[in-house]
Amino acid sequence: MVIICTTPSFVFSVIGAVKRSESKAVIMKHHGAVCMGTSYEDAFAVATALEDVCEKFIIERCCDISGKAVEAFSGVVDYVTDVIKSGDKYRAATEFAPCNSARKGNFLFVGEEGKHAAIIDLKSGAQVGGGEIPDSADLHWAIYKKRDDVNYIRHTKEENVVAMSRKGNTMKPLLDDLAQLCGPKIKTAIFNPNETLKTSKRVAKALGKNNAVLIKDNGAICVAGNEYDAEAVELVMEKGCKTAVGAELYAETKPIGTLDAHLMNFIYKVKYSKKAGK
């Protein structure tokens, strides 16, 4: 685990916790956990066991407050989704199929998983080849037009991400890597396949300078300058949303403070840009 945003007091508190405990793991608020072992394999086994214990803890919490027999984390997602949908303010948005895309020169390649990608001219927005244009092609086009630094877009509809997208709220990070990679706060925007041009601009605006934006009832759009980084943003977004789903089971959970989240994001971008420039 790499912790990018640290302070001397934070480091000393972790060292102190390690010294005071005979445990092989120390949980750090907003920073995951440090897992130790006599070898890489031993430390990895500790990390796996800790993940299992934490997931079981959340599942048991869901059983207690729902009165239902929940056996897997997917049951927690189902319960949280039902609670969100039953709220007075919930208004369902039109759901649509996710697409991934890539910018290659002056062209946009966009398509659903397993289908032949459509090829679109980035300047005009007109199709110049490839397969059928998907419903969300204008959404991808709008982001590329607004963000010169973006070359890859991934649309995840992983169950935890979809659950959090149904809230329709701005999501504040509970984990440091979400603040670092995705943004200090993740907004939600509505995309309507029947009003693509207007709603695509709203999504691009909500994304801003971040690397992720929630799409109401449709998961999240994750962006980056290359394919590897886009996949990393997607993975962190999915993990961050899983954490947020678990947090829905508790009355009071405190996200990372606004100033700290912006600082984490800024330091990550500065360090990453220096690394990329080498």
What feature does the model see in each segment?
Residues 1-278:
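Glycine-rich flexible loops
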